[in-house]
Regions:
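Short secondary-structure boundary elements
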Residues: 1-157, 161-169, 174
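Tandem amphipathic alpha-helical repeat scaffolds
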Residues: 86, 124, 141-147, 164, ...
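Start-of-helix signal in alpha-solenoid helical-repeat scaffolds, especially tetratricopeptide repeats
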Residues: 76, 97, 101, 116-123, ...
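TPR-repeat structural position
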Residues: 93, 97, 132, 149-152, ...
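Amphipathic alpha-helical segments of tetratricopeptide repeats
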Residues: 61, 105-109, 143-144, 163-175, ...
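Short coil/turn linkers that connect adjacent helices within long alpha-helical scaffolds
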Residues: 69, 110-116, 128-129, 149-151, ...
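Helix-turn-helix repeat elements of alpha-solenoid scaffolds
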Residues: 97-101, 114-119, 154-167, 201-212, ...
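Flexible inter-repeat linkers and adjacent short helices
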Residues: 132-230
Length: 317
């Protein structure tokens, strides 16, 4: 048989300890004793073991777990990821979901600091419990938490996990209607676009794909603020690829969409986009004249406290 089969057979030789391994397997490769004890005691858990500690020691003696003391807490680690997988997969799917739901409840009730520092941990258990709406919010929270730490690749992975979950709940065997589904996806796609620009650059194919999907959503929702942001993003995408004609056409669309009485910040962004294109086309007198108008609008408008990318600084570049 496979190594997985051999590991499962070793667990089967310790039937009571196997139940403790199943709880530990649901918690992850490494888990603190306080957490497994709290889950074992939780009313919603499908597994309740009257004497947990001797069973954990039996798993240590069998070479399936290691134990170490870190300060005041005792940590258990599966010796190999395959041991953890064998324990986790040996449960019925129904019981696995119930166990992950219990873990999520315990984390929220008794391990708030852990949830704050590792929101992806809670999101993972909520997803594995089939708590789709909670997991979706959790993955978004984890992405924003990672982005605040400039962990951009980690944040991107969390957002892609959220989008995959959203797709799973829209179509397929796990389909379940979620309120505000398209608005949620649009928010996630906009956040993802910024992260991809940071890690891959404005001209990356993935950035274009995210913008295209987000445009479909924004048009369907009639979200003018999002459409403005996305058009400017697409203008930047084509500009950075050297397609000035396409960038100019989109910048014209942006200006036309603003109407006769545009919001000052939106007008400033559109004007700067035009000026930037003119400059790189070598049309310097036109670029300078438009940039001067942008700076005049900027000085009158007082936009500094409300923007991430300072348009006045961009005009001076």
């Amino acid at each position: 048989g496979t190594l997985q089969d051999l590991l499962t057979a070793r667990l089967d030789q310790l039937p009571q300890a196997k139940r403790a391994a199943q709880v530990g397997g649901a918690l992850g490769r490494v888990f603190p004793q306080a957490l497994i004890e709290a889950v074992n005691a939780h009313a919603a858990s499908p597994i309740h073991l009257p004497a947990l500690d001797p069973l954990l020691q039996a798993l240590v003696q069998a070479g399936l777990l290691t134990a170490e003391q870190q300060g005041e807490q005792r940590l258990y680690t599966f010796r190999h990821a395959l041991v953890r997988d064998a324990a986790h997969q040996s449960m019925l799917e129904r019981d696995r979901r119930r166990l992950h739901a219990a873990i999520a409840a315990v984390l929220q009730a008794h391990f708030a600091a852990l949830c704050d520092s590792q929101p992806e941990l809670l999101a993972l258990h909520q997803e594995q419990a089939g708590l789709w709406a909670e997991a979706l919010a959790g993955w978004e929270r984890a992405a924003r938490h990672a982005a605040r730490r400039s962990a951009h690749h980690e944040a991107t992975a969390h957002l892609k996990r959220a989008l995959a979950l959203l797709a799973r709940t829209t179509d397929g065997p796990d389909a379940a209607p979620l309120p505000g589904r398209d608005a949620t996806e649009l928010r996630l796609q906009l956040l993802l676009s910024g992260l991809l620009i940071t890690t891959q650059g404005y001209a990356a194919d993935q950035v274009r794909a995210v913008y295209d999907r987000a445009l479909v959503l924004a048009r369907g929702l009639g979200d003018e603020a999002a459409l403005h942001k996305l058009r400017l993003g697409l203008e930047g995408y084509h500009f950075m690829r050297g397609d000035f004609a396409r960038a100019q056409a989109i910048a014209d669309e942006v200006t036309a969409s603003l109407g006769d009485h545009p919001e000052p910040q939106a007008r400033l962004q559109a004007s700067w986009a035009h000026a930037n294109i003119l400059f790189h086309q070598g049309r310097l007198p036109e670029a300078v004249a438009l940039t001067d108008r942008c700076l005049a609008d900027y000085r009158q408008g007082g936009h500094r406290a409300t923007t991430v990318q300072d348009a006045g600084v961009m005009c001076l570049c």
